[in-house]
Amino acid sequence: MSSPSSDADSAGLFGYEDDQDPVSVKSRTGFVLTLFGCPVIFQSKLQKEVTLSSTAAEYDAFSMAMRELLPMRQLLQEFGDKLGLEVLKTSLVNSTGFEDSQGCISLVNVPKMSSRNKYLQLKYHFFREEIGESKGIVAKYISTLEQKADIFTKGLPQKQFEKIRFLLMGW
């Protein structure tokens, strides 16, 4: 099973994101993709644009994780087909994207757009046709306390850092 976890630190609250611009309000995106529980792809970077809301920042982060997940799923599916590995064929049907923003989950799972979020449609909706139980990727809410991607976007207290490190690395 492949599972992405994505997060965004809205408005650059992580700290001084850009040493050339210490008052930057760009959000920091972070995500980790795991395959059978092991981290295989991770990233932390500033978003290219200033987002208008924390939901938009989280949606951008989810979109970035999907840009990595979709080709990885296709590659593993091809390995399964060529090598006759049933475990790769069946387990990839169950990819779950974990997100700690209810607003983002709502945008991902509900195919309608409103005038308030229509500007997100063109830029980030490339993955929408891949989302759904029948398509193989499901977006689910996860508590901020369990969000693995927080380690890439926030300065965490030691106890929380160690908890997330254990969730990611097992130590």
Question: Predicted regions: what is each one?
Answer:
Residues 1-171:
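Divalent metal-binding acidic/histidine catalytic loops
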